[in-house]
Amino acid sequence: MLITELRRSNFTLFLFPAATCDHARNMSSTSINGRGELNQLLRLAGPLIVNNLSIAGMNMADAMMSGRLGADALAAVAVGGSVWLLAFTLALGVLMAISPIAARYFGAGRPDMIGRYSRQGMYIAVAYGIPVVVFGQFLVGPLLALIGIDTAFRDLTTSYVGAIAWGAPAIYVFLALRFTTEGIGRTTPIMYTSVFAFVCNVFLNYVLMFGKFGFPAMGVVGCGLASAITMWLVALVFAWHIVVAPAYKPLKIFARLAPPRPEVLREIIALGLPIAITITAEVGLFAGMSILIGTRGTEITAAHQIALNFASTAFMVPLALSSAITIRVGQLLGRGDPAAARRAGGIGIVVCAGFMAASAIVLLVFPDFIVGMYTSDPVVSGIAVSLLLVAAIFQVADGVQIGAAGGLRGYKDTGIPMAINLFAYWLVAFPLAYLATITYVMPANFIWGAFVAGLTLAAVLLTWRFARLSRNSLTAS
């Protein structure tokens, strides 16, 4: 049924009936049919899925290899990684604004403007990266002391963050270049770079953490240093690729050293800061709910981590599709084809929902098998199975909300989505989770029910926002 609808040229009318037949008839000759649009989205998303899984693999490798050093080292990398994640997501969100901007200019046939925004994005990357280095070297220790972390564990965590922070300027410059590449629809180089990063990170972990090939064993410092070196290698390799690949020549990214342009910097930050706040709010929600569940005991906490890990892994696919939706919608709007942009967004949202529906079916049919891959503890297994059944409920909503968010970024609409997510996550989901936690009579799956409420509300509101905004764009055209 889904494929049949995707083949129809009036797919947008199927999803958003408010669009009129006149709008559909007025689509430009550059538009492609629903099946062709699906192929375009999957072509863009495929390499990004590999990229996301490679990043997840690096995090898993860090955890597994630091675990061989002992529980203290594993905990230090976990806590230090959370501190680093906060700094990383803030920059990630701001620099993500380059993707829809580049997509618009690419669709409009203005490669010179893409290069301008890419260069200014690198200024933002360096300006943000240097304070992160300073924070990692001098401020993490006092911060951990302030919240009461004991001295020995604090020293381990501080040394890890101090080492990984040296890579901040490089990884942020890479992000500026990566989102430029995304915007022009070249996602395959991103995939190759992420695989290269995974191999480098694991190899350098082995050498620096355990003292191989004549290097001293550095433990958690080696883990952080391996990540930092990998970040610099990735930035240099990707910059080299952009310099030598013919596809980037019209962009003239490195053709000259342009001074900072305040108006361009303001545009990137104004578009990207709401994205950064949205990502941070979502990361904060999951972290906060993990802390709340942690008050219920080790078995419930372990079960929560199992369910969250599987759900997060499945989320890598719609996350990549969301980026592909941003690219397609932005390019089609830049081309002056709002009807095709609306259709691309609608198809993307349905594909995200469809994949997550398939994931939900897997959770409903094979919960015991999935949990068995993580633990054999009967108590933890029983709780984890019940949480996976709740996770199956919010899978579709999670896919819809990330798909709609991707479409809205293509329209360069980030302020209202930020407000929607803050409301759904922190004024609905978290208070419900807190109430379920303090009552103690409610089982853990009631706490996870807060995920369902927040994500479902976000999905409904973001989809409504996309439908309205895309319809207004059609009317204006």
Predicted regions and their residues:
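Hydrophobic transmembrane alpha-helices of multi-pass small-molecule transporters
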Residues: 86-89, 133, 201-205, 235-239, ...
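Short runs within selected transmembrane alpha-helices of multi-pass transporters and secretion channels
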Residues: 95, 99, 164-183, 190-198, ...
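Small-residue-rich hydrophobic transmembrane alpha-helices
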Residues: 74-134, 171-190, 290, 303-367, ...
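N-terminal transmembrane alpha-helices
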Residues: 32-64, 68-69, 82-101, 126-133, ...
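Helix-terminus/linker motif at the lipid-water interface of multi-pass membrane proteins
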Residues: 53, 57-75, 144-151, 207-218, ...
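Residue-level hotspots within pore-lining transmembrane alpha-helices
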Residues: 54, 58, 87-91, 131, ...
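Transmembrane helical elements of multi-pass membrane transporters/channels
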Residues: 43-62, 163, 174, 197, ...
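Short alpha-helical transmembrane segments in multi-pass integral membrane proteins
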Residues: 5, 12-45, 102-169, 215-273, ...
